[in-house]
């Protein structure tokens, strides 16, 4: 999607070789190599998830997937919580099957007291932020400015940000 493509472009601009996996099976119009899931897992140093939750992505990153990843791999789930199995991720981190994870979504939110991820106290292995971590004062101010401009344009009968 748009977010994944944006992240891929930034990574590419920093000199990363970008590959991707498409759970939908659709080949994107991007200059990156598409891999089958198992190859994608074996080759990736960093996996950044920006996918919707559906039958094909639910529990996609589970014990089987973590067993195929590099021990030095970092997993970022910025999509939907249930794409990653929290218990299996905890085990993978505790056993050194992957190096680290960064999450702004969880399998069940708000996080429950018995979530196994809470056992991991090492912030070099696991960082969890709210899904609204983008919500800096500047971002929220810009958002409100856009809302104001859209309302002002609408009351004048003007089209703004219209895709034709």
Place the predicted regions along the sequence by residue.
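Rossmann-like dinucleotide/phosphate-binding beta-alpha-beta segment
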Residues: 1-71
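Rossmann-like dinucleotide-binding domain for NAD(H)/NADP(H)
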Residues: 72, 78-164
């Amino acid at each position: 999607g748009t977010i994944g493509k944006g992240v891929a472009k930034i990574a590419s601009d920093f000199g990363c070789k970008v590959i991707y996996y498409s759970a939908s099976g659709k080949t994107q119009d991007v200059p990156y190599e598409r891999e089958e899931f198992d190859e994608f897992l074996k080759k990736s140093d960093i996996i950044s998830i920006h996918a919707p939750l559906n039958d094909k992505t639910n529990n996609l990153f589970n014990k089987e997937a973590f067993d195929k990843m590099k021990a030095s791999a970092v997993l970022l789930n910025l999509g939907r919580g249930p794409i990653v199995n929290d218990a299996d991720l905890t085990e993978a981190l505790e056993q050194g099957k992957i190096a680290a994870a960064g999450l702004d979504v969880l399998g069940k939110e708000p996080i429950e007291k018995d979530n196994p991820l809470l056992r991991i106290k090492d912030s070099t292995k696991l960082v969890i932020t709210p899904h609204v971590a983008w919500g800096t004062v500047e971002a929220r101010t810009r958002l409100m400015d856009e809302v104001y401009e859209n309302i002002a344009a609408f009351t004048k009968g003007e089209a703004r940000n219209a895709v034709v």
